[in-house]
Amino acid sequence: MKEITFDAFYQLYQNEQLSLVDVREVDEFETLHLEGAHNLPLSQLADTYDQLDTDQLHYVICKSGMRSARACQFLSEQGYEVINVQGGMMAFEEL
C-alpha cells in the first residue's frame, strides 16, 4: 500500500487540486474536515465506493491512519489508485 506522511500530503493539498476521500463517520466529518474532502465512511464504503473515479488518484484520510489503511486496501482491490495519509486528521489538528 502506498502511503504519504501528513506533512508531505498537506504541501500537495495546499498547491494542487487533489481527490481526498475522508473515511471517518459522518459526525466526525461534520465536526472537522479538510475543504474539498469527499466523505465516504468506512462503514458504508462497500456500498458507496463506486462514486469514485477509477481514473483518478485518491488520497484517503481518517482520524489517525488506521481506517484509511483498511479503506486503501479495499479500494486497491477494486482497482482504484489510492494513497493512505499517515497521521490523519490528528496530524492536521497539530499544525
Predicted ranges, named:
Residues 1-19, 26-57, 66-95:
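Rhodanese-like catalytic fold shared by cysteine-dependent sulfurtransferases
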Residues 61:
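Short, surface-exposed ligand- or partner-binding patches at beta-edge/loop junctions that are enriched
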